[in-house]
Structures are given as C-alpha cells and as structure tokens.
Amino acid sequence: MASSKNGTVLFVSLMILLLISTGVKAYCERVRSRSAPHDICKKKNGNAVCKEKCWTIEKYQNGRCLILPKTTKLDCYCYHFDQC
C-alpha cells in the first residue's frame, strides 16, 4: 500500500513540475508587437512608445525595442517578465 502512495505522489509531483515549467516558458516568451509601427524603434522615444503599445493594446507588462538572435533588425517586442 505504501508503494502505491509513493508512486501516486511521485506522479502528481512530476505533473505539477511539468505544468509549471511549460507555463513559465510560454509566459516569458517575447512576442513581436502587432500594434506598434515597424519604424517605431528608430525614433528617440521608441522604447517608451513600444512599452505603451504593449501595455495598453496587447496587455503585456513590458515592451522594449530589441534585436533578438534570430532577427537582424531592431523591433518592438512584448513580454511579461523582465528577467526572461
């Protein structure tokens, strides 16, 4: 009987860990802004406008002009956590 409980606890723990790890990854993902103009990052206040668009229109907590490793140009990206 103890072996059955240990197996159940291990299975539930593994499922919780799996759910947390996949949820955090999707929550930290940086997404190209759909509402910000493509040339916004070339302007003096580009980061501020990018953050405002991400916050008010797309409901993300943060937004910033970034060059991601897969891209070669500066674009506005939205994301939830600053530490991602």
UniProtKB/Swiss-Prot annotation:
TM segment ranges: none
Top-level taxon in the UniProt lineage: Eukaryota
Subcellular location: Secreted
Residue pairs linked by disulfide bridges in the UniProt entry: C28-C84, C41-C65, C50-C76, C54-C78
Residues spanning the signal sequence: 1-26
Family from the record: Belongs to the DEFL family.
A biological process term (GO) from this entry: killing of cells of another organism
Listed GO CC annotations: extracellular region
Keywords: Antimicrobial, Disulfide bond, Fungicide, Plant defense, Secreted, Signal
Protein name as annotated: Putative defensin-like protein 38
Keyword check for 4Fe-4S: no
